């Protein structure tokens, strides 16, 4: 049995190592990004990223693959999520990009603006890749045209030496802001495994094991990622407060917490980093779960009060207990009372008949008295 268990563990470790090696291979696309259709990545994969810049050869596809990351959304914009969503295409076409002399790709904002201008008064299909489990989806965004009074002013002092900033926006604000960011940046997360210091900084701040993921830090200190980066930052903030941004996979929300680091420079919890500790796919939508919970526990609709027991909850599914007792008493006592009533009637009739017979037999003594 021990040998079988040892072989199973060895096989599992080998499969994990193969998966990690495949994800770290510069020539293969990371498994986290394979949900994106290949046609949306062709513009970046075919760009001259192999160009040599200052003696460094950029050949890692996973590090250079980028998208328009959502960094801010309006409170009325429910289709997109900041930090997690990346725009990787429009109308099933890749994001227009251009390459500089060093082989790096960046968005062609002039072409992107023209795409939005062409769809004024219509909906635009936006291809979204999410860092929550590496999923892909499509969203349709309504492009509202600007009023004639709201059009952008064109500067008359045009300097030919300065490049044009692009076409004028003929559409209203979209309700979100983007930044050209590598997709791999969304994997720089630290999974809370357990709390190892009672009443330590992690426990005092409310970190939840297995559910929480540290996805950011104040001043963008975790933006570059790295297995030991969080540990180094915590040590450098000994005796100071540190603001962390934590994602909870159960509630599907991000919350900021302030952790007071002690003099020992420890956070008080074990964290996991890497391929096995990335943010998983959301199992359910919080709004749908809330609606489902409301459906499971329906609130009774108020009805006019008809009796003293009308306030009992769920009266429409099961009769109230007091009503049952009263009905039992009525069923149990009324028949007995009626039986007694009829029995009493029967007894009276029989006694009356007997008394009548006794009255008929009574005359003989009267005859004797008359003879005397």
UniProtKB/Swiss-Prot annotation:
Pfam families: GRASP55_65 (PF04495)
Membrane topology: Peripheral membrane protein
Cellular component per GO, a single term: cytosol
The keyword Lyase appears for this protein: no
A biological process term (GO) from this entry: protein secretion
Residues with N-acetylmethionine modification: 1
PTM info: N-terminal acetylation; by N-terminal acetyltransferase NatC.
UniProt cross-references to PROSITE patterns, sorted A to Z: PDZ_GRASP (PS51865)
Location(s), subcellular: Cytoplasm; Golgi apparatus, cis-Golgi network membrane
Superkingdom field: Eukaryota
Record keywords, A-Z: Acetylation, Cytoplasm, ER-Golgi transport, Golgi apparatus, Membrane, Phosphoprotein, Repeat, Transport
Major location category of this protein: cytoplasm
GO MF terms held by the record: protein-containing complex binding
Other noteworthy facts: Present with 2730 molecules/cell in log phase SD medium.
Subunit structure: Homodimer. Interacts with BUG1 (via C-terminus), probably forming a heterooligomer consisting of a GRH1 dimer and a BUG1 dimer. Interacts with COPII coat components SEC23, SEC24, SFB2 and SFB3.
Function: Involved in the spindle assembly checkpoint. Involved in ER to Golgi vesicle-mediated transport by either facilitating USO1-dependent and -independent tethering or increasing target accuracy of fusion events of COPII-coated vesicles.
Name of the molecule in the record: GRASP65 homolog protein 1
Organism encoding this protein: Saccharomyces cerevisiae (strain ATCC 204508 / S288c) (Baker's yeast)
């Amino acid at each position: 049995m021990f040998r079988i268990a040892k072989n199973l563990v060895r096989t599992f470790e080998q499969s994990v190592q193969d998966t990690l090696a495949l994800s770290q291979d510069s020539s293969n696309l990371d498994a986290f990004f394979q949900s994106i259709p290949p046609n949306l990545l062709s513009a970046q994969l075919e760009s001259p990223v192999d160009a040599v810049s200052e003696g460094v050869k950029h050949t890692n596809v996973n590090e250079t693959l980028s998208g328009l990351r959502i960094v801010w959304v309006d409170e009325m914009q429910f289709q997109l999520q900041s930090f997690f969503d990346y725009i990787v295409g429009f109308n099933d076409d890749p994001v227009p990009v251009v390459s500089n002399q060093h082989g790096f790709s960046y968005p062609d904002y002039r072409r992107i603006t023209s795409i939005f201008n062409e769809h004024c008064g219509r909906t635009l299909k936006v291809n979204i890749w999410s860092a929550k489990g590496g999923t892909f989806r499509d969203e349709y965004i309504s492009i509202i045209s600007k009023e004639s009074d709201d059009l952008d002013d064109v500067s008359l002092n045009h300097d030919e030496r300065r490049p044009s900033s692009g076409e004028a926006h003929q559409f209203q604000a979209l309700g979100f802001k983007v930044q050209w960011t590598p997709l791999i940046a969304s994997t720089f997360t630290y999974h809370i495994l357990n709390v190892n210091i009672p009443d330590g900084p992690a426990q005092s701040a409310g970190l939840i094991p297995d559910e929480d993921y540290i996805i950011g830090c104040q001043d963008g200190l975790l933006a570059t990622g790295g297995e030991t980066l969080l540990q180094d930052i915590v040590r450098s903030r000994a005796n100071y407060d540190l603001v962390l941004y934590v994602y909870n996979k159960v509630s599907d929300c991000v919350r900021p917490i302030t952790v007071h680091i002690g003099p020992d420079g420890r956070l008080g919890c074990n964290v996991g980093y890497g391929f096995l500790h990335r943010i998983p796919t959301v199992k359910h939508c919080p709004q749908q779960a809330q609606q489902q919970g409301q459906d499971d526990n329906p609130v009774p609709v108020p009805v006019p009060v008809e009796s003293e027991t009308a306030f009992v909850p769920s009266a429409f599914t099961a009769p109230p207990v007091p009503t049952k007792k009263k009905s039992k008493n009525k069923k149990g006592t009324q028949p007995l009372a009626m039986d007694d009533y009829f029995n009493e009637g029967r007894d009276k009739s029989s006694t009356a008949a007997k008394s009548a017979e006794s009255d008929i037999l009574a005359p003989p003594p009267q005859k004797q008295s008359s003879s005397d």
